[in-house]
A protein has these predicted regions:
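Hydrophobic aliphatic residue packing
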Residues: 34-36, 128, 170
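Active-site-adjacent C-terminal substructures of enzyme catalytic domains
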Residues: 1-95, 104-110
Length: 170
């Protein structure tokens, strides 16, 4: 019924597993043709980002669902499926002429690009652009592309963020 109504399902497996010891029947949702999105739930029980939530979904897919989802489908669930669900596919969500260049550039360590996205960790994020403008990334890249980005430090790595950029026009 959800697929027939054009609905989507937001799947937060980390939060589900921590709070309830189980998660939704995501394989059934896929079988029914539901648009599936993966994202963190909330701070106390969820992951800190979609990138981290993707790792839990991947573990569940491999160990419980017996690879019901391909790596490509899991990556779609943190990217294009979300854009499609909120009705923004005419503006962003794909690399296409005329769409906003919202991109994430990662270090490459896996031959398969979708597996690379799934296994990427915070230090692997080299650059994030929103509307073609750099907003987050490696310090050297952000210094070359922006004026005086704010430097932030993680455990064993540093990144830079442009906190002056305003992309919201009211």
């Amino acid at each position: 019924m959800l697929a027939e109504a054009g609905g989507s399902l937001a799947w937060s497996p980390t939060s589900n597993l921590l709070l309830y010891g189980q998660t939704t029947n995501i394989a059934s949702a896929k079988e029914e043709g539901v648009n599936i999105m993966i994202g963190p739930d909330w701070g106390p029980s969820g992951s800190k980002s979609s990138m981290h939530e993707l790792k839990t979904a991947d573990w569940w897919n491999r160990n419980v669902l017996e690879n019901t989802f391909t790596d490509f489908e899991l990556v779609q669930a943190i990217s294009t499926n979300i854009v499609d669900a909120i009705g923004w596919s005419d503006y962003t969500g794909r690399i296409k002429v005329g769409l906003a260049a919202d991109l994430v550039v990662l270090d490459t360590f896996e031959q398969d690009p979708y597996r690379n996205v799934i296994l990427a960790t915070d230090p692997d994020v080299r650059l994030v652009t929103v509307g073609g403008l750099p907003v987050y990334g490696d310090v050297d890249i952000m210094n070359a592309m922006t004026d005086e980005p704010e430097i932030i430090h993680g455990t064993g790595f540093s990144k830079a963020v442009d906190i002056t950029l305003s992309l919201i026009h009211i």
